[in-house]
Amino acid sequence: GLSVLVQSQGRNLIYDGGGRGASSFTVSYLQQQGVTDIQYLISSHYDEDHVAGLVGCLNAFHVEQVIGADYVQDTKIYESFMKGVEAQGLSVQHPAVGTEFSFGSGKFTILAPSSISGDDNGNSVVIKLENGSNSFIFTGDASAESEAAMCGSGLDLECDVLSVSHHGSATATSWEFLQAAVPELAVVSCGADNSYGHPHRDTMDRLESMGIQIYRTDKQGTVTAVSDGTTIKWNQAPCNDYSPGDESDQGTQPEVTDAPDQTVMVWISATGSKYHNKPDCGNMNPDKAVQMSEADAQAGGYEPCKKCF
């Protein structure tokens, strides 16, 4: 599951609450942090492992605003969540992408979803939290399709810290999204020895290849970060353990393709993992782009950019 508590100037925001097994822990942890009122309670989506703990919070604390995805789920836990919202005299808000909310010394912006589909994970509410020059993105279980929509939204996706989508599943954390967000650190929230094999090898390989340091709750437990608007201090060092949850996970094997034309020239960025047909694609810095043949780029492990190829 996933649960994030944000505190600033006496105000509290909770993003997801974890599953049933963690609900009492979530409520107890918030009480230990002095929480009595929650200004923003955000449910990324309504899967049990994200929303169950929020039901406990609705029963234990006074809540001022509830934000969630604009769809209905036919489950008992969703019904319990909605009853808890109604008992507070509230309704679930569905703010549009780009909507900003002030919070303590900072603010947060809605990045997704831009539309609602039949994919519950893809409907996840994604937010970017900013405090001074520090920024964090919380993704819920956002899908690769949702990430692509965010990349095309024109919103600023760069962040210092990324909460990795869907517990490190290979269904998200795409190259395109990582290259737009360029986080220095990532947090993977997943249960130890979970039955899904989270995090998946493909995702961890992408994080490692971009030099993104990682925290993992399955290895390190609760992770806390304190931002003063300039620097971020953590309660522990990153574990930088990029191994998959299931050691038998071999990841996606590359497809065999025809040999590339040696005369085709492409561009690569200083830190990216894709090659481009122009030096200023996306967030690339053309002054730092390097030109080489397509054959050499592929031999170096680079993949074609989906935007310009």
Describe each model-derived feature in a short phrase.
Residues 1-258, 282, 306:
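Non-globular, low-confidence helical/coil segments that flank catalytic cores
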Residues 237, 243-309:
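Mature, structured domains enriched in cysteine- and short glycine motifs
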